[in-house]
Amino acid sequence: MYAVIKTGGKQYRVAAGEKIKVEQIAADVGQEIVFNEVLAVGNGAELKVGTPLVSGATVSVTVLAHGKHDKVSIFKMRRRKHYQKRQGHRQQFTELLVNTIAG
């Protein structure tokens, strides 16, 4: 069984027992979270697609860790003007373990 959930402005296809990294969520490590924004639920050949959400469907997850992704380097330059600008960014994430999918 799998589901498509929406969190942090993105959509993720998840299955029970999977680990996923999502945009940072304000929750403690070990805390259980329930996602109600389920866009689709599938089980083999059967697929329920919501309009826009599947009513009564939930996905239960546990927070495993918080962290930062690898650094992304940004370099801007204007030719012949001696303008150079360097910038770096590390996006924060939350690692989740999918416990159950109901719906």
UniProtKB/Swiss-Prot annotation:
One Pfam family cited in the UniProt record for this chain: Ribosomal_L21p
Keywords noted in UniProt: Ribonucleoprotein, Ribosomal protein, RNA-binding, rRNA-binding
PROSITE patterns referenced in this protein's UniProt entry, alphabetically: RIBOSOMAL_L21 (PS01169)
Entry GO MF terms: rRNA binding; structural constituent of ribosome
InterPro entries for the chain: bL21-like, bL21-like_sf, Ribosomal_bL21, Ribosomal_bL21_CS
Source organism, top-level taxon: Bacteria
Gene Ontology CC entries for this record: cytoplasm; ribonucleoprotein complex; ribosome
One GO biological process term: translation
Quaternary structure, from the entry: Part of the 50S ribosomal subunit. Contacts protein L20.
Family recorded in the similarity comment: Belongs to the bacterial ribosomal protein bL21 family.
Known role: This protein binds to 23S rRNA in the presence of protein L20.
Protein name stated in the entry: Large ribosomal subunit protein bL21
